[in-house]
Amino acid sequence: MAKRREKRGRRRQHRSHRKIQRIIDGADFINYMPDDILHHILSFIPTDLAMRTSVLSRRWRHVWCETPCLDIKLKHGETNQTLTSYTAPIITSFKLVMDLNDNTVPQVDSWIEFALSRNVQNLSVFVRDFTYTKTYRFPDIFYISSSLKQLDVTLDFFDMIPTCAVSWKSLRNLTLRFCQIPDESMHNILSGCPILESLTLDTCRLLERLDLSKSPNLRRLDINRQYRRTGPIAIVAPHIYYLRLTYSSTPSTIVDVSSLSEANLNIISDRLLSPLTADRYQTMALEMLSKFHNVKRLTVGETILQILSLAELRGVPFPTLKVQTLTVKTEFVRSVIPGISRLLQNSPGLKKLTLHTLQLSHDIMEMHPLKGLYPDQCWRSTCEVFPTSKEIYKMLGCNDATSKLVASFMNLVLRNAKTLERMVVWLGGIYFNGDAPWFEEELFDMVETLSHNNNVSILLKQSNC
C-alpha cells in the first residue's frame, strides 16, 4: 500500500516537472524567434517600453535597437538617449510626440533630422506648444526627403511656411492637422509632391483657396473645418474621386470636382441655425449637390438633411443626381423627412439606401421662425407620423412605437425610390428595451413582408450606437 502511494507521488512529481519544462521551452521559443518577428512584435508598443526588454536576457539586449518602427513620446522637461543607441539603417515608421518649450526646440529638430537620415518612410510628428509663442518652424531639411511615403503633421496652430522648395518626391499620403498654412505655402507643398494620392486637412487655418488642378494623381480629399476661425475655402479639385467635407460655421465653395464619384458631406452645428446661417447653408448645400455631376455614392448627415428640408419647404429647386448608393446618418425625426424624400425623388437611378440611426444634435424646428416660416406647422400635415426630436425621446425603448416608426420610414423610402434594389437600416440600441427576441421576431417579420411585397431586399441590423 505504501509502495503504491509512493509510486503515485513520483508520477505526480514527474508530471509537474514536465509542465514546468514546457513553460521554460515556451519562453525559449520566443527567444529563438528570428529578429524580424521580434522587431514586428516590438513595433506595437512605445519605444520606451521596447527599450526595457533589453534587461530580459543577453538575446534581447540589442533587439530594440534594430527595430524599424519607433514611437517616441517626450513630455515637458524630458530628455532621451535613444538616438545614440539606435542602430537600424532604415526606419519604416517613426512617431514623435513632443512638448515644446524653450529647451526642447533643438530636440525636435534633432529627432526630425535623425528620422530623415534613416530614410524614414512613414513619419508622424505631433508638437504641442508650452511656450505659447507659436514661433516654432520646421528646419529646411524637413521639407526635403526622397524616402517619405506617408506624412502626418499635427501642430498647435504653428505656421507651416516652408522657406525652401519642398521636395517630397515619394509622398503618397499627407495629413496636416491644426496647422496655419497660407495659400502660397500650400502651393509650394503640393508642387513638391508629384505623386500625392491622398490629402487630409484637419482644422487648418489661413488657407482660402485649395487648388489641386496640378495634382493629377490626387484621388482622395478629406477636409475638416469644424473650428470657427478656419474661414471659408474654395476647392478646385478636378481629379479627385473621393471627397469628405465636414464644416461648422463657415461654409466652403466647391469650384470643380468634375471627376468625383463618392462624396461624404456633414455639418457639425454647435448652435441653432439663425435665419442668416440657414440661408447661407441652404445655398451652399444646393450648390454643392449641383456640382456632383458624376457622384455615384453619397453620404449625408442630419444637418444637411434638415437644410434640404427647409429648401423643400421654401420651394427651392433641387438638382437631379446620378447617385446609385445613398447613405444617411440621422434619426427618424420630422425635420429630416422632407429632405430625405426629395433626395430619393431626385436620384432616379438609386439602387441602394443605407440608414444609420444616430442621436440628433440640433433640430431646426426648435429655432426661431425663419422669415415667417414655421417648419413644424408646415411639416406636420405631411410628416405627422414622424415625431419631433423632443417627442422621439418619449418613444425610445417602446417596442411597439419603434416598430411603427421603422415601418413608416421604410414605406416612405419605397414610395419615393422607384428603382431601389436594396435597403439596409442600422438601428441603434437606444430604440430598444433590451428585448432581443422581440427585435428578431416582430421587426424581422415586418421587414420580410415589405421586402416580398415590393421586390426590394431589406436588411434590418442592430448597431451598438
Swiss-Prot record:
LRR repeats lie at residues 127-155, 178-203, 207-225, 278-302, 332-357, 402-427, 447-465. It comes from the Eukaryota. Residues 27-73 form the F-box domain. The keyword Repeat applies. Keywords: Leucine-rich repeat, Repeat. PANTHER family: OJ000223_09.16 PROTEIN (PTHR32153). This is Putative F-box/LRR-repeat protein At3g28410. It comes from Arabidopsis thaliana (Mouse-ear cress). The lineage of its organism: Eukaryota, Viridiplantae, Streptophyta, Embryophyta, Tracheophyta.
